[in-house]
Every structure is written in C-alpha cells, then in structure tokens.
C-alpha cells in the first residue's frame, strides 16, 4: 500500500512556514532548515538575537502558524498551548489513516517514529536516549517515580509547598501507605538571593533524607528555582533530586546533564507546543535500576535497561501523538531554543513593566527578578477576586489566562507586543 504520510498537507505547511521565514524582512537572518537533523542544527549559526527577539515582524509571522482566532489572545501557556497548524494536521491525518488501516504492518511505523522521537528528545534536552521514556504527561511521569522508588519506612522526602499535586499529594499518599516521611518547605515570597531559595530545603535535610523534589518553575507563583544549584548541593550530600519541568520544557534552553538532576518530568502540550498525551520521564542512567515499574504490559521485559523499555510500557495508547513529536521538536529547532527562551522572557518582562505603568495598583505574586522568574506572570488586583477577573478577561476582552495563585498570564511565542498592550488595557479597565 502506498505510504501517503509524507505527501500530506502538514508537510506543505512546513515548507510554507520555511518560505515565509526566509522571505522579506527576514531574508538576512540565518535560519535553520526544518527537517534537518539535530546534529546538523547544532553546527549552524544561531540567529543574531539583537535582530530577532525584538523583531515584531518576525514574531507576527510566527503567530500566524497557530490556529488562534484573531479575536482571542491565548495567555495560558502554563496550562495548555495550541500547536502549529501542521502539527494538528499531522496528528489528524495519522489518526485518519490508522482508522482506515489498523494492521500490524501499518502500525509498525509508530515504533520507528517513537525511536526517532526518543533520539531527538534526548538531544533536545542534553541526555542519552536510554535515559528517557515517553509517557502521557508530567503527572504520569511523577507517579512512576513516586511509586517506583524503593524507599523504606523512615526515609525522608523533602518537597516544595508549591509542587503540583502529582508531586505533592502523591508523596503524602506514599507516606500513608508505607511510612516514609514527607517534609514540606516554604520559600520566601520575595527572595533577595538564590541562597534564600536553597536554604529551606537543606535546613530540613537530615541523614535520612533520600530525595528533594521540586517544581523548576511554580505554576501558582511563577517563581523559578535555581535547579542546577539545588541539584549540585543535593548530590554533594548524597540526596537524589526530582525536578518537575512542566513549566520549563520548551520554554527554557535545557541541558539536563548540565543541570545535574537525577529525575526530570514534563509534558509536551504546554510550552513545547506539542500534541496532547505526551510526556517525558528522564532519569540518570545509574538510577534506572532504582525504580520498580508501576505498570507492566505486553512487551515488558525484566532485562530491559532503558527507561522507555523498563518503565514506559503502558499498554495500548494513542500512538498518533508521539508520532508528531519529531516534527514538534523540528519546529522548535527551526526557531532556536535560546531564541524561544529569550523571546518568552522578553515578553514576560515587558508585561510586568506595562502592568506597573498602566495598573499601578496591581500587586505581583511573581518575583520581578528575571533570575527568580521565567515566563509566568501572576498578579492580584485590590478588591478583586482572581476567578472573577479571569472570567471577565475572557468573556469581555477575549483574553485566556488562568486564576491559579492569582491572575495568571503566561505569554509564548504566538503572542506579540500588541497583545500585551491589549492585556494591560483590559486589566486597567477591570481594576477600577
């Protein structure tokens, strides 16, 4: 049977995107070619950032690659992001073909694409392909670690009180089940230094502490923790580290080996701009044998040594979403990981300044320091309930944010400076 996947419209979308990038005002900018390998990608020069990060003509072009109506502004990257047109169409067309042909022969391509996705994701985050597995989301990845680590009664786990429930309540349930001790630490809301963010974790540590588990970036305050410094200090004390990267994968230019964490979890449907039901589970190679598998299905082997084969054999699942992971990563690399981080940081910093100027009565939950924050901006308006403002922003102004920890706004590369003006105008109107 003829393979039509390579001839579908998503590929045309990618070609069109590349032509647009190379056209007009962007002709002088060195741009990676979509579809090239990651090794080739790293050999090509990066964009000149002084010409790109603030080049609104370019980012307006990027915005057009997403299926967001002109009357809506999406500011909920911390929860869910749209995918580019061609990713949506690739998933849809693959699902359609699967429904037409569920044979083992047709489905063999999913295993091939999964292998490619693992290789590309490993390079994307600076690890070995044997150290990562594809799961369905961050929650599942966290759960596999919480339930898989062979801790004993009396062993201690230290968690941040701003962790996601899958990295907090899950530990508390584990404590009730077999007697581990969970210590929860609170960090200062307005830290003056990195040391103030680290000290509470290590002040709580004892000789029985086995793991420190924390969100890289909090979804309820926007605070970014010094992951590399925490991981290094923990390693020096023979303490494992789990970094929940739900808010950093796809937003930050990551290298997990450089970060030094023992475990890292994330999803692709947030900042990575990928399809639903994809997550990653990373662990340092020497930690693979520390975990018991939580789920065992057909194809699992006790002799498996890779993370994907030992811990991520989860039974029948929707394989059309991992099928689009390589293209998702290619899209990111075509723009540049550092360029994306710089752009998001620029947008969030700009948003903070505009709020301070136009809505001076607003109070910031998120630290103003760029060293202690990233892409998430959370504020409160005096006398206003965040849930009420959140609803009116959407219903009256067409702005989609969130009400987690306050009024949460998280811009991404599909947002522009003109979007930020509309947002701050709306906040000023609602603050009255």
Language model: regions and residue ranges:
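Pyridoxal 5′-phosphate
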Residues: 2-432
